[in-house]
């Protein structure tokens, strides 16, 4: 085969793609669908009565290979109860400049407090705004949830909370 045909064969791929319909994504105006199991931004979850699931054990921070999570636990008191256990996460921060989205923190969490949402639009022009604190990570209160701190549900134990058998707060229903 003559050498000049090698160049023509190489252009065959180019000519073949010239007549295909272009695939254009109009991203900011029309975001495309996101897979249900997509791992995006983290979320700290709550129990049905509004108490936080995070117990401040720091296992997520230890599991993080990028050292992107900082947790500082504190003790619950009867006057100020944020989670059903002895402790809660007083300070919780995720540095999205370091996070690699691996999900090891999710696997390490013993109370299923930390999950990943489908939210992927976290870009910012200020580096400090990409360190998410507990205020940005906590799941919003849904109807029937009381804002912590408040007492555990009457007659409920830590095990009831862990098994998910606690119903929405009676305090929130009264509001």
Curated annotation (Swiss-Prot):
The keyword Hydrolase does not apply. One of its GO terms (biological process) is aerobic respiration. It is an enzyme of class 7 (translocase). [4Fe-4S] cluster 1 binds at residues 54, 57, 60, 109. [4Fe-4S] cluster 2 binds at residues 64, 99, 102, 105. NDH-1 shuttles electrons from NADH, via FMN and iron-sulfur (Fe-S) centers, to quinones in the respiratory chain. The immediate electron acceptor for the enzyme in this species is believed to be menaquinone. Couples the redox reaction to proton translocation (for every two electrons transferred, four hydrogen ions are translocated across the cytoplasmic membrane), and thus conserves the redox energy in a proton gradient. This is NADH-quinone oxidoreductase subunit I. The lineage of its organism: Bacteria, Bacillati, Actinomycetota, Actinomycetes, Mycobacteriales.
């Amino acid at each position: 085969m003559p050498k000049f045909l090698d160049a023509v064969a190489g252009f065959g791929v180019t000519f073949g793609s010239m007549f295909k319909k272009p695939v254009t994504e109009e991203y900011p105006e029309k975001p495309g669908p996101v897979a249900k199991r997509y791992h995006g931004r983290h979320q700290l979850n709550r129990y049905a009565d509004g108490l936080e699931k995070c117990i401040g054990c720091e296992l997520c921070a230890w599991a993080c290979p990028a050292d992107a999570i900082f947790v500082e636990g504190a003790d619950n008191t009867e006057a100020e109860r944020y989670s059903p256990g002895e402790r809660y996460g007083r300070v919780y921060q995720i540095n999205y400049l370091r996070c690699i989205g691996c999900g090891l923190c999710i696997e390490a969490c013993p109370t299923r407090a930390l999950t990943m949402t489908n939210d992927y639009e976290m870009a910012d022009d200020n580096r400090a705004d990409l360190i998410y604190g507990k205020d940005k990570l906590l799941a919003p209160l849904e109807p029937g949830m009381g804002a912590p701190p408040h007492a555990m549900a009457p007659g409920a134990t830590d095990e009831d909370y862990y098994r998910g058998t606690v119903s929405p707060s009676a305090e929130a229903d009264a509001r």
